[in-house]
């Protein structure tokens, strides 16, 4: 508690503002320690799950996706679970909140982001070290995921009417953006807002497919999307089928909504 630290650290001789600064610094040190302990704990669980128990994937809606292992992955977790279960490639994965890495050397930082939401446009200097955006900057988790939204092309042949001729034409490939196992918590609103903006700017057909466990989870996701995007925007996107919802174990439902 503050009172015990107040006497233990000898802050009683300091001015009030200085003592509060010292307390804040102590909180930051404790947060760093908590993140280190969380990394050790998650590394242990990761080892148990995949090295000891040998957990394998069960049947899900993701089974409808061909070449799933070649997908680009925006990972909100600290562990590389998608690689273990679906064979995705690390070079095509962005750990937006950092990742566990017990093998890193002492001169490399812990990249795990573990903070609170930044709800205000104005920067509150007292809360900055605890906020996710600040930690993402300091820990350099980057914006690699934005590359996932760049246009990709395929060649199609257009037939010239009235002739037997056709000529090649570069067309933009559609993108299916599948959100699996995420509550769409507004804590990550800036990432979702950026993803929607990039998809709209891309000029290609796109669809955000949100998977849900049950009806309660679906309602929660819709509520969170309304907070992140605004009610009118969400209504617009669902009306144009740019946003759809599929139960997480519904392979047939996923097949129906995937853009070709």
Feature map (PLM): residue ranges:
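Extended, H/D-rich, highly charged conserved domains that either
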Residues: 1-150
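Generic alpha-helix signal with a bias toward terminal, lower-confidence helices
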Residues: 18, 88, 101, 105-108, ...
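Glycine-rich anion-binding loop/nest that anchors nucleotide
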Residues: 71-77, 127-192, 207-214
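A broadly tuned preference for mixed-charge, low-complexity surface segments
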Residues: 119-155, 226-249, 257-260
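SIR2/sirtuin-family catalytic core signature
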Residues: 163-260
